[in-house]
């Protein structure tokens, strides 16, 4: 079992974006969750930083996923099983070409 919030959630993906370069570079992360990037506080990203999410999405390769998790929200799941959204807001799952948002109680797959 692992719980992470904010930076503790970001480190679960494969990479952590370098905010100083607006996502053009990144640092290796733990790769515990089968996604390229985990973006916490997704609904609270300030307007000036919105291009970061676009830059990260553009870096995704076919089959890769980026997750945005809103504030006061969590996703809980296991490998090879669906993940469930808990909390007040939504979780957002992005590929390079598609996006889908899930509310509390909804389930989604990370394609694993």
Descriptions of predicted regions:
Residues 1-15:
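Catalytic nucleophile loop
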Residues 16-112:
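C-terminal and late-domain segments of enzyme folds
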